[in-house]
Amino acid sequence: PGPWTGASDETEWTSSGNKAKLINNNSIDATENTMVLYRWKSWYSGIHESAVFTKYVDQAPLTASERAQWKAEAKALRAIYYFYLVRTYGPVPVLEDDYALDTPSNELQLSRSTVDRCFDFIVSELKEAQNAGLLEDASSDKTTGVGRIDKAIAQAFIIEALTYRASWLFNGECNY
């Protein structure tokens, strides 16, 4: 065995757990893989929380500039969560608005959006966030700016999304 064996189909997981058998037999799928489900659920939860935050932030006692900044950050986070989903799973359903809790289940069974739709949505949301109140340089404020999304971070995600869009993984309109 060479140093690259772990990255090939010659890998054998020697754990005694159930996942080892599934991996060794090439039969693992999303229903048995908690990591796959965790990412899907947590990123869509982030999208939902961003939408709910944006919907209700106007009721909070904030200044106009704080409100604009926080809405822009929520919009950028939503786009980033979509980018993570698309990068991991390929095209996903793009939800522009949050669904009400009493929405009939047949209306919630959405098909994947196209590759173009996903990336267009991600890039447009990030550009809107840049123009809607993101800070120029959040890291310059060492007390409240650390960890906040600013224009440079949004631009970095735009560049990364467009790079993925142009790559062989997503270049061409296919629905997988």
For every predicted segment, state its role.
Residues Y44, H48, D120, A152-F157, ...:
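A structural signal for well-ordered alpha-helical segments within the folded catalytic domains
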